[in-house]
From Swiss-Prot:
It comes from Shewanella halifaxensis (strain HAW-EB4). This is UDP-N-acetylglucosamine 1-carboxyvinyltransferase. CDD domains: UdpNAET (cd01555). The gene is murA. Phosphoenolpyruvate binds at K22, N23. Belongs to the EPSP synthase family. MurA subfamily.
Length: 420
């Protein structure tokens, strides 16, 4: 199993090219099941979860071809299997997103209950309840979701009990081929949901209101393939910006979208960073300045993203002052705190809040990645810690960050992938 070996690196400097968004690419790839003709997707990151999604589509009989560094072509002409098996689904929670497309186009789907990061329950009931309102018959049996519909799904007025990105995406895809109008209230507003909606519209879907809390979908008879480019990864962007702030550096993120990161950029400015943006780039300058402590509360978009919480734990660990970070989206999402404490961070947990007292320096240590974003926080900590940091179990990192060690090296970071 690979590890990352990280040495204190000084101030990061230079340009980093941001990859396509994993959390947009995964549902967009699943949407390929809805298309009757070839579907071409570009700016697809080369990640473990993306590879798992492609393998899942192949398992169903679709032809999936990767070309260049970022292109995927999907053909469903020979799709003839409707079961997403445990062996694939167990490694990636987003596999549940195949449920809506299979059911909408083929009327049948068997999907193993999903896996992914162990950061809380994240139940699938909202997905199932919405599909049942659209006429699906669903039972959960022997670890599988077994869904059937006679004829086409029917449009429905769905009010979601809580905001769920995955459920919004699943219902959006299912409703695109349903009979009649579907209204989703209390829908997730994340940019990745909007990106999926824009992709579906390019395929011929009729969708209004994506990016608001009420989305209207008028079902159509069929969807066709198209050429679509995945949005930039806002969480990767934010992670590099935090790394630059923590190391007191100056970097520019290109192929980025500042409009999707307003809450994160505001907190970085509160921490003392100078931020400059263009249409597709963000520059952060923290040269010669120690970050100031910033209080964080994670909330659904457009609020502060839960996927940036761990990175700001590191920033606050080295900041001037004391800060609190409150996690409201997922339970059990402070698993990085004990690992950062091993590096000398002064942190204490009180329920869903972490109280962080900033100190001058961290010390290198052997630490263990517990989930995707926690692993990114440990890498950032290693860049600024005195001595050597070894991050174990970086397969979590490979699920969501493309060539992270190479990108940090390009900014002057001393990061090396080593075999166990």
């Amino acid at each position: 199993m690979d590890k990352l070996k990280i040495e204190a690196s000084g101030a990061l400097a230079g340009n980093v090219v941001i990859s396509g968004a994993k959390n947009a690419a995964l549902p967009i790839l699943m949407a390929g099941v809805l298309a009757e003709t070839d579907f071409n997707v570009s700016n697809v990151p080369n990640l473990r979860d993306v590879n798992t999604s492609c393998e899942l589509l192949r398992c169903l009989g679709a032809e999936v071809t990767r070309s260049g560094t970022d292109k995927v072509c999907i053909s469903t002409t020979n799709l003839n299997e409707f079961c997403a098996p445990y062996e694939l689904v167990k490694t990636m929670r987003a596999s549940i997103l195949i449920l809506g497309p299979l059911l909408a186009r083929y009327g049948t789907a068997d999907v193993s209950l999903p896996g992914g990061c162990a950061i809380g329950a994240r139940p699938v009931n909202l997905h199932l309840q919405g599909l049942e309102q659209m006429g699906a018959k669903i039972e959960v049996k022997e670890g599988y979701i077994k869904a059937r519909v006679d004829g086409r799904l029917k449009g429905a007025h769905i009010f979601m009990d809580m905001i769920s990105v995955g459920a919004t995406e699943n219902l959006l895809m299912a409703a695109a081929l349903a009979d009649g109008e579907t209204i989703i209230e209390n829908a997730a507003r994340e940019p990745e949901v909007v990106d999926l909606a824009n992709c579906l519209i390019a395929m011929g879907a009729k969708i209004e209101g994506a990016g608001t809390d009420t989305v209207r979908i008028q079902g159509v008879e069929s969807l066709q393939g198209c050429d679509y480019q995945v949005m930039p990864d806002r969480i990767e962007t934010g992670s590099f910006l935090v790394a630059a702030a923590v190391t007191r550096g100056k970097i520019r993120c290109t192929k980025a979208d500042p409009k999707t990161l307003e809450s994160v950029l505001a907190k970085l400015e509160d921490a003392g960073a100078s931020i400059t943006t263009g249409d597709d780039w963000i520059e952060l300058d923290m040269q010669g300045k120690r970050p100031k402590a910033v209080n964080i509360k994670t909330v659904a978009y457009p609020g502060f993203p839960t996927d940036m919480q761990a990175q700001f734990c590191v920033l606050n660990a080295l900041a001037e002052g004391t800060a609190t970070i409150t996690e409201t989206i997922f339970e059990n999402r402070f698993m990085h705190v004990p690992e950062l404490s091993r590096m000398g961070a002064t942190m204490e947990l009180e329920g869903n809040t972490c109280i962080i007292h900033g100190i001058e320096k961290l010390n290198g240590a052997q630490v263990m990645a517990t989930d995707l974003r926690a692993s990114a926080s440990l890498v950032i900590a290693g860049l600024v810690a005195e001595g050597t940091t070894i991050v174990d179990r970086i397969y979590h990192l490979d699920r969501g960050y493309e060539h992270i060690e190479d990108k940090f090296k390009g900014l002057g970071g001393h990061v090396e992938r080593v075999k166990s």
